């Protein structure tokens, strides 16, 4: 954040969760607040996603880094995309100890049909005992309700150990 200010970049970096902090309209909004131990639920509600969508250009992208130490947040974001009529593509990044990266899952929400038709999802692989890819792991879970400012439940979510 501070280094981008020193470099006088031409791309504004908006921090904070205040909805009034977001000017209209962005090409891309990135949510990256879920990789720790706690989940800021207020950022995953219908009302929050309506604000994000209102500040996107019609063909804009909402990128959500859903990697979390304990919970599979993919179905929560999927329900939000469905409620907004947005398409979803997922991007999985395998861990790479040499590059000091860990496994990450990103969800890209958009109404841009050209993008949705051109780029398939990249989901986490399922590997056999020899390490060969034999399929892709499904990330969505049926039965997870739409989170709102008045309702959210982690009970149906997949827990990680």
What is each PLM-predicted segment?
Residues 35-36, 67-71:
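Short "lid" loop at the C-terminus of a central beta-strand within the Rossmann-like core
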Residues 35-44:
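Glycine/threonine-rich flexible loop motifs
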Residues 59-66:
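Conserved beta-strand signature within the Rossmann-like core of class I S-adenosyl-L-methionine
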Residues 1-20:
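Single conserved hydrophobic/aromatic residue that forms the stacking wall/gate
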Residues 23-30:
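A short acidic, Gly/Pro-enriched loop at the edge of an enzyme's catalytic core
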Residues 21-23, 39, 75, 79, ...:
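Soluble small-group transferase modules, centered on the S-adenosyl donor enzyme superfamily
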Residues 44-58:
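A short glycine-rich, Lys/Arg-flanked "PGG" loop and its adjoining helix->strand segment in the class I
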Residues 30-31, 64:
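Redox-cofactor binding/interface segments in oxidoreductases and associated redox assembly factors
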């Amino acid at each position: 954040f501070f280094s981008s200010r020193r470099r006088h970049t031409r791309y504004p970096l908006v921090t904070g969760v205040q909805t009034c902090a977001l000017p209209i309209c962005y090409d891309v909004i990135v949510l990256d607040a879920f990789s720790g131990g706690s989940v800021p639920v207020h950022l995953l509600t219908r009302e929050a996603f309506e604000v994000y969508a209102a500040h996107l250009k019609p063909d804009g992208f909402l990128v959500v880094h859903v990697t979390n130490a304990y919970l599979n947040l993919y179905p929560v974001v999927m329900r939000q995309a469905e409620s907004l009529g947005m398409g979803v593509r997922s991007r999985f990044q395998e861990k790479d100890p040499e590059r000091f990266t860990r496994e990450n899952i990103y969800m890209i929400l958009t109404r841009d049909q050209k993008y949705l038709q051109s780029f398939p999802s990249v989901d986490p692989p399922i590997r056999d005992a020899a390490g060969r890819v034999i399929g892709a792991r499904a990330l969505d879970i049926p039965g997870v309700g739409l989170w709102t400012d008045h309702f959210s439940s982690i009970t149906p979510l997949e827990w990680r150990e």
